[in-house]
């Protein structure tokens, strides 16, 4: 069974576009593991481990206009798909993730 006409309802954006959305007030959710989060994360992000989100997605209170981030953009794309399935609008996957953030020389926060 082909599903080619199934539309993906989240945007896959790189660092410059993500930074603009953050300035516009988008929520940033980091879905990496605790040890990764503790090494440093995008300033202002909140932390929900991907498996926790997938186990009970509706409990996480994801709002419209959310950017999901992980190390590179793979796990965050899974979270983005789940958010869209929950009916969240204007979902963005940060393609490049915290690696791109650090590579650009941008600051990170630690808990």
How should each PLM-predicted stretch be described?
Residues 1-27, 34-66, 74-111:
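Rhodanese-like catalytic fold shared by cysteine-dependent sulfurtransferases
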